[in-house]
Amino acid sequence: MDSPSSIATGSLRIEQSVTNQIIRQAALTVPGCVEKAAGVRSVLGKTLPQADITTDGPYIAAEVHIAVSWPAPVAQVARSVREVVRSHLEAYMDAQVTEVSVFVDTITT
């Protein structure tokens, strides 16, 4: 049996699309945050929620764009999305989250 010091180590790379999916699924767990094609994103075939991610080693910063259903409290939904996204990134990616900015791109009725 190999001792821990003799086992070869490797690298781990998680594709940005996986990180985006984690963020998307996290955001959609928040009541009032809904899936929606909006603006230019709809022309590109992208739906909200959507994330733009910046990584630097173990550090992640995310901009999350969401749609909120009317009459949900917009500010509370955005705060909850920020908290849930941070929690999911830390739990599922073992990442050190430096920032999560949430942008409400549209309200649905």
Predicted segments — roles?
Residues 1-75, 79, 91, 95-109:
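Contiguous, often N-terminal, cationic amphipathic patches that form binding interfaces
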